[in-house]
């Protein structure tokens, strides 16, 4: 047994015999046949021949061995009773209070001291102290009639008109009452009657304050709900200009695609017009193809003229122009076309100037000099057309793809043709690039104007060399050797036969090579069984 230490040693009786604990239930034999024996027999039915192995070490519940320092010490009952008695005496001694002599005790003073912690500032002065402290003023000795009003919020001004009027009137009355209360506190004119009235008002106004708080909370919730509903509207309003710009750009793109479609379809007509110069100048006027072409040309000129009138400015009160007819001479047709061009040139220049100013950047750095900085688009176009040494104008008179007849004859320059192959190739290249980008991204394909069937090369998708049958790419990949390059199978181009080759190698160095054919014949004559028995004859 471990020796007692510390305080336990003081209560230890050296003469006390160590008694052994006795458990009355320890010697009771557990009956195998008791209540529930029938159930146990049913459970063990068919398994009587099994060997009982008992519980495993993992299933045995063993207590934790905390060590000898956690074991208790034996204490006698007398020592335990003495300790409890001493503790009760200490509690009784601490609970005793010192009382004064009842004959000399001042009960009123003792009651005042007992209630000193609960006295309020309003009842601090008694009736006997009024004369002594009548000239003194105690500030903030009473509670205000109503709490200070909260700071105004945006929700306070979002209520209905009736509530606004009531709230404004109530705030004025509250301000007046606050001013009166402050004046009374400063001057010291408030009396106990006013304070009692204020206390009564406070009790009566408690419900009103709760109602006001509920109203303010509901107003705040309404304002929050309105603010949340206004957020998507504000976001939609802020993004609306961007949406309008996007729609306008889409419409411009459609118009540009339509004009490019017209230019592509007019390519054959331009080639035919440039080919007229190379044909016979005196065709048969009575031929049927000539008349059909003339009617088609007059119809096309009328269509172009009507389009110019529709897009041009309206001229009210003017006489309706005469349509072109086959019976008109070439000079009359040319004069009418010149008149239409003069009427449309002013409107066309105004529109070009307007849109050039809109699309022009603010920080454009023009050429040096004031004239170059102030040059407009119209003046620049006129200079390009009037200048005879202009490179673009000269290039338009060189026959290429748009004038195949002159190009076949080797003509270097012809003033009667118009060939814009350079500009046309640039337009086609931009169209192919645009269709390629739209096809790869998958956007805008439905909005594009159908022009011509173009086979644009799509970007080849580089896919990784992944074995789909492997388990998450964990299949081992290896290369045995490099692929053979520039490999060709050998081809026998020799003129000698195999027998001649053997004879040549056999007669080299002046002697005949023995092929040991005789020895092979002798070996063939030996019996296989006889050769196998030689091992046992030795």
UniProtKB/Swiss-Prot annotation:
It is found in: Nucleus, Nucleolus. GO terms for biological process: maturation of SSU-rRNA from tricistronic rRNA transcript (SSU-rRNA, 5.8S rRNA, LSU-rRNA). Its main location: nucleus. Residues 290-363 form a coiled coil. Belongs to the AATF family. Residues 7-23 have a biased composition (Basic and acidic residues). Residues 80-105, 172-222 have a biased composition (Acidic residues). The lineage of its organism: Eukaryota, Fungi, Dikarya, Ascomycota, Pezizomycotina. InterPro entries: AATF, AATF/Bfr2, AATF_C. It comes from Gibberella zeae (strain ATCC MYA-4620 / CBS 123657 / FGSC 9075 / NRRL 31084 / PH-1) (Wheat head blight fungus). It comes from the Eukaryota. Keywords: Coiled coil, Nucleus. This is Protein BFR2. Residues 1-239 are annotated as: Disordered. One of its GO terms (cellular component) is nucleolus.
């Amino acid at each position: 047994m471990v020796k007692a230490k510390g305080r336990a040693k003081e209560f230890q009786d050296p003469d006390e015999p160590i008694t052994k604990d006795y458990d009355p239930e320890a010697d009771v034999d557990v009956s195998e046949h008791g209540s529930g024996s029938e159930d146990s027999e049913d459970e063990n039915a068919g398994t009587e021949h099994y060997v009982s192995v008992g519980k495993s070490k993992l299933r045995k519940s063993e207590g934790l061995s905390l060590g000898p320092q956690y074991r208790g010490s034996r204490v006698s009952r007398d020592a335990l009773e003495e300790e409890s008695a001493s503790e009760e005496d200490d509690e009784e001694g601490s609970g005793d209070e010192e009382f004064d002599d009842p004959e000399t005790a001042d009960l009123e003073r003792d009651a005042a001291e007992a209630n000193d912690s609960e006295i309020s500032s309003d009842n601090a002065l008694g009736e006997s102290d009024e004369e002594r402290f009548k000239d003194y003023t105690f500030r903030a000795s009473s509670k205000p009639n109503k709490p200070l009003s909260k700071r105004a919020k945006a929700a306070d001004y979002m209520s209905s008109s009736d509530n606004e009027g009531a709230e404004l009137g109530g705030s004025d009355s509250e301000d007046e009452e606050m001013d009166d209360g402050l004046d009374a506190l400063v001057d010291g004119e408030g009396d106990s009657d006013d304070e009692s009235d204020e206390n009564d008002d406070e009790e009566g106004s408690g419900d009103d304050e709760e109602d006001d708080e509920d109203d303010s909370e509901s107003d705040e919730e309404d304002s929050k709900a309105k603010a949340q509903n206004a957020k998507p509207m504000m976001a939609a309003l802020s993004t609306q200009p961007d949406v309008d710009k996007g729609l306008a750009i889409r419409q411009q793109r459609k118009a540009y695609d339509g004009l490019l479609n017209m230019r592509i379809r007019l390519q054959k007509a331009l080639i035919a017009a440039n080919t007229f110069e190379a044909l016979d100048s005196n065709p048969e006027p009575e031929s049927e193809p000539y008349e059909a072409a003339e009617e088609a040309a007059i119809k096309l000129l009328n269509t172009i003229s009507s389009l110019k009138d529709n897009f041009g400015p309206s001229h009210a009160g003017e006489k309706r122009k005469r349509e072109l007819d086959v019976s008109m001479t070439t000079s009359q047709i040319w004069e009418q076309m010149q008149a239409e061009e003069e009427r449309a040139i002013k409107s066309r220049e105004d529109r070009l100037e307007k849109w050039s100013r809109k699309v022009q950047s603010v920080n454009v750095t023009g050429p040096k000099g004031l004239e170059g900085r102030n040059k407009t688009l119209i003046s620049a176009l006129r200079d390009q057309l009037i200048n005879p040494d202009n490179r673009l104008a000269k290039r338009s008179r060189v026959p290429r793809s748009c004038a195949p007849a002159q190009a076949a004859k080797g003509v270097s320059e012809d003033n009667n043709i118009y060939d814009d192959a350079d500009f046309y190739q640039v337009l086609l290249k931009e169209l192919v690039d645009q269709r390629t980008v739209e096809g790869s991204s998958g956007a805008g394909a439905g909005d594009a104007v159908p022009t011509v069937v173009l086979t644009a090369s799509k970007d080849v998708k580089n896919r990784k060399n992944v074995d789909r049958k492997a388990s998450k790419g964990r299949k081992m990949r290896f290369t045995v050797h490099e692929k053979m390059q520039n490999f060709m199978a050998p081809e026998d181009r020799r003129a000698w036969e195999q027998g001649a080759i053997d004879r040549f190698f056999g007669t080299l160095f002046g002697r005949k090579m023995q092929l040991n054919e005789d020895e092979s014949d002798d070996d063939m004559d030996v019996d296989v069984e006889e050769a196998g028995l030689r091992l046992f004859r030795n």
